[in-house]
């Protein structure tokens, strides 16, 4: 599963790990991606999205119908 949120567009961020002796090594911070199924009453079917936890809050706030409409307007295939 890729570390990409379909709702918010969050991707991994990159930086450095710094040890006690200040040696720096590359690392990445992945968003907390959850694979969730949502029921769309207007279409009578369920869809599965890769969503970050912030994306889940967005869906709770605005509703799945409006979020899916924005995704389709953006060109996401659902």
Swiss-Prot record:
Keywords carried by this UniProt record: Ribonucleoprotein, Ribosomal protein
InterPro entries on file: Bacterial_rp_bL28, Ribosomal_bL28, Ribosomal_bL28/bL31-like_sf, Ribosomal_bL28_bact-type, Ribosomal_bL28_sf
Highest taxon listed in the record's lineage: Bacteria
Gene Ontology cellular component terms for the protein in this record: ribonucleoprotein complex; ribosome
GO BP terms, alphabetized: translation
Gene Ontology MF annotations: structural constituent of ribosome
SUPFAM superfamilies reported in the protein's UniProt record: L28p-like
Disordered: annotated segments: 1-27
UniProt similarity note: Belongs to the bacterial ribosomal protein bL28 family.
Name of the protein: Large ribosomal subunit protein bL28
């Amino acid at each position: 599963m890729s570390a990409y949120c379909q709702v918010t567009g969050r991707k991994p961020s990159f930086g450095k790990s710094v040890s006690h002796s200040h040696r720096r090594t590359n690392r990445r911070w992945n968003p907390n991606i959850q694979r969730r199924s949502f029921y769309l009453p207007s279409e009578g079917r369920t869809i599965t999205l890769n969503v970050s936890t912030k994306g889940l809050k967005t869906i709770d706030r605005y509703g799945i119908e409006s979020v899916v409409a924005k995704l389709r307007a953006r060109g996401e295939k659902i």
